């Protein structure tokens, strides 16, 4: 979807039994063309290899080894098109002890530590939709890898395999916080740090109309403006978090 939005001509290969009738309301299908194919049919595979000779990128999301069994693995495809960028998306990577296991976003971000960092301290970790593993650590990392591979291919005429695993991508997104912890600037435990709900000026509050407001007044000048708008007269910065959080909640 992202590459199509950027202008790429994307052709989706769908199972023959679907007849290419994936939901027109699924945003992931926008800006794409769809063809159907029986990948277990040798003649069909040969037709796809002829198509692969003409394209810049192939990417797939099967479990490790499936494309090889179908006769469409990276070695075969790169032999057909030496400039090809071959993208692969899995949950746990192409090899390793967990590579053949099933999984979902919540599993990948659980292992990477992202899930444990989100939520209130007196509750269980809160699943943040499937934004971190599937999209941020998965699709967006793969899209960046593919674009980088294309630049390399354009400059060198050499294709390559781009291997993207959602568990690796979500761990990469956590690298800043792990570096803060190593430097002594991040504490274990939810609601213990500036960006995880500890700071009263970076949090959400329920308003009198039963809707919610998100406050992000980290910088002193914005914090001063926040106090002014809420008619809170404390002049010392920083002040008692507990004291001001109570005043801020009351103001909303």
Regions inferred by a protein language model and the residue ranges of each:
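Short beta-strand "acidic-cap" motif of Rossmann-like dinucleotide-binding folds
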Residues: 9-13
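Aromatic-enriched alpha-helical interface/lid elements that frame and gate functional surfaces
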Residues: 196, 201-245
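Active-site-adjacent "lid/gating" segments in soluble enzymes
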Residues: 2, 6, 70-213, 217
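Conserved N-terminal glycine-rich FAD pyrophosphate-binding loop of Rossmann-like flavoproteins
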Residues: 23-29
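A short, hydrophobic C-terminal helix/tail in secreted or cell-surface proteins
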Residues: 246-252
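Short glycine/proline-centered loop/turn elements that form peptide/ligand docking sites
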Residues: 15-21
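A structured beta-alpha segment of the ubiquitous adenosine-cofactor-binding alpha/beta core
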Residues: 31-78
């Amino acid at each position: 979807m992202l590459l199509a939005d950027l202008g790429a001509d994307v052709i989706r290969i769908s199972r023959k039994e679907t007849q290419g009738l994936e939901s027109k309301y699924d945003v992931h299908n926008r800006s794409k063309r769809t063809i159907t194919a029986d990948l277990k049919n040798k003649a069909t595979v040969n037709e796809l290899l002829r198509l692969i000779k003409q394209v810049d990128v192939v990417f797939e999301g099967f479990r490790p080894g499936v494309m090889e069994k179908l006769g469409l693995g990276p070695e075969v495809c790169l032999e057909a098109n030496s400039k090809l960028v071959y993208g692969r998306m899995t949950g746990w990577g192409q090899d390793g002890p967990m590579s053949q296991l099933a999984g979902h976003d919540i599993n990948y971000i659980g292992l990477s530590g992202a899930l444990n960092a989100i939520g209130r301290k007196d509750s269980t970790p809160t699943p943040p939709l499937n934004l971190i593993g599937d999209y941020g650590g998965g699709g967006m990392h793969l899209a960046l890898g593919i674009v980088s591979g294309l630049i390399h291919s354009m400059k060198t005429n050499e294709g390559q395999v781009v291997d993207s695993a959602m568990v690796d991508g979500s761990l990469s997104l956590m690298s800043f916080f792990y570096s803060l912890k190593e430097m002594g600037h991040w504490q274990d435990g939810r609601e213990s740090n500036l960006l995880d709900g500890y700071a009263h000026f970076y949090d959400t509050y329920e308003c009198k109309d039963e809707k919610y407001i998100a406050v992000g007044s980290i910088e002193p000048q914005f914090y001063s403006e926040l106090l002014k708008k809420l008619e809170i007269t404390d002049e010392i910065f920083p002040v008692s978090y507990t004291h001001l959080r109570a005043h801020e909640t009351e103001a909303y």
